[in-house]
Amino acid sequence: MINPEHISTYEHDDYVLMILDHLQNFSLDDEMACLPPWRRDVVMAIHHEQGKRQSVAAYRLLMMLLERHCGISGHVAMAYHDGGKPYLPHHPNIHFNMSHCRCAVACVVAKRNVGVDIESIRRFNDSLARHVLSDDEYLMVTASPSPQREFIRLWTMKESKLKMTGTGLRTDIKTVLYNDESIYDTIINDNYFVTVCLDNS
């Protein structure tokens, strides 16, 4: 089973975030047995084990958050908006989002529309930065003492905003932070950055 010692919990007035690292340290079969059939089918359709672990962990974190902080126990139905954003059709006042990276999985529940993105810290990629950053953002990143960390901070902000709105590829990622009034919280770990984006409209 998932070891609670490997879960970090961050409580905010508007949301609760859980992060699980050590993705190799739980029994995939045991955790799969705890899933509803529809989620098990989703996991089984994933071909590589790491992806299966990420999918299982994301749903298990959601179940923990719903039980501990929303008073909802047992399995819940999940549906998807046209843009691919998941939601809980039987609990319209509960907002949630999930994300994963190579080394960890994050799940957030909130009182308002929310998005989350988690990214592993990796080497700075100049061509990727030019592709996703505005000119001003690119100059800010390359002038930073740590371009890789500043880039990942902005990247997780952009991704969490796109996941909050559910617009995905329909939005120009270079301009997604322009005139933005969303609320952002970023958590920095030795291995990853996590950003939560809350709707402030």
What are the residue ranges of the model-derived segments?
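Core catalytic alpha/beta fold that binds nucleotide/phospho-ligands
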Residues: 1-201
